[in-house]
Amino acid sequence: MKNKLTVQEMILTLQKFWSSNGCMLMQAYDTEKGAGTMSPYTFLRAIGPEPWNAAYVEPSRRPADGRYGENPNRLYQHHQFQVVMKPSPENIQELYLESLKLLGIDPLEHDIRFVEDNWENPSMGCAGLGWEVWLDGMEITQFTYFQQVGGLQCHPVTSEITYGLERLASYIQEVESVYDLEWTQGVKYGEIFVQPEYEHSKYSFEISNQEMLLENFDKFEKEAKRCIEESLVHPAYDYILKCSHTFNLLDARGAVSVTERAGYLARIRNMARSVAKIFVAEREKLGFPLLNKDQHVSKEAE
């Protein structure tokens, strides 16, 4: 491969490409989450009739996947480049393949496959038709058409593209370990992230206070419900994200039994559904401001 972009150059290339194709460039959301889908820029905006086109990098924390900075590709925190487009463009797959070309990956020279992998996130009431994108036998992207988010049907359909930046960069730079990636010229990925990987793994598996985390979950849940009662969508959703991350820490610590796990996930899911319903209702009160007049007319005609 001729063009070995740094991780930083990859991000800038994707930002420029998707911006030129109508996406707003958002910034990473400042609350811990397990995936870019859980950002309010995806979760909330995928529901309701308003159009939404956004792209952003999202650091995603998965405590159970931490490996003390010793595993070449299993990470406590990885980075996703998230693209969300509603309504989904007819040529979304072609746009994706075009973006790969700009990263130096010519689809005509590589084995690129869309492998069916329908997606769901039960804890957030989400599901959709999906594909894993495989590049020469390695998964690099998740491609999803949302059918349901927060228990609500998605009309119009939202398309989501989630690039796994570390995996994609490992392929482009031809390295075996993510820690050998060049983040920018002269600075390795490991020089930035190996210490936090070690420390967060040690905390998640050995040091975290289970009793405190259990109490925190209950407190965050209580506060989320208070916000829901006041129809405060975004504060409520922040506390739901805190509940989700706290659960993931408990799960990594082995503090949650199989039976308890289902109960915790149901508690998170019920709150997520409530927030989704309130969000759509509040946007409707505002007249769905991101809809243009033609879409208003079309909606009324239906």
Curated annotation (Swiss-Prot):
SUPFAM superfamilies documented for this protein: Class II aaRS and biotin synthetases (SSF55681)
GO molecular function list: ATP binding; catalytic activity, acting on a protein; glycine-tRNA ligase activity; transferase activity
EC number: 6.1.1.14
Enzyme class: ligase
RNA-binding keyword on record: no
Matching InterPro entries: aa-tRNA-synth_II/BPL/LPL (IPR045864), Gly-tRNA-synth_heterodimer (IPR006194), Gly-tRNA_ligase_asu (IPR002310)
Compartments in which it is found: Cytoplasm
GO cellular component, one term: cytosol
Keywords: Aminoacyl-tRNA synthetase, ATP-binding, Cytoplasm, Ligase, Nucleotide-binding, Protein biosynthesis
KW Cytoplasm (keyword) present: yes
CDD domains: GlyRS_alpha_core
Catalysed reactions, semicolon-separated: tRNA(Gly) + glycine + ATP = glycyl-tRNA(Gly) + AMP + diphosphate
GO terms of biological process kind: glycyl-tRNA aminoacylation
Extent of the signal sequence: none
Binding partners and assembly: Tetramer of two alpha and two beta subunits.
Family: Belongs to the class-II aminoacyl-tRNA synthetase family.
HAMAP family referenced in this protein's UniProt entry, alphabetically: Gly_tRNA_synth_alpha
Name of the molecule in the record: Glycine--tRNA ligase alpha subunit
Name of encoding gene: glyQ
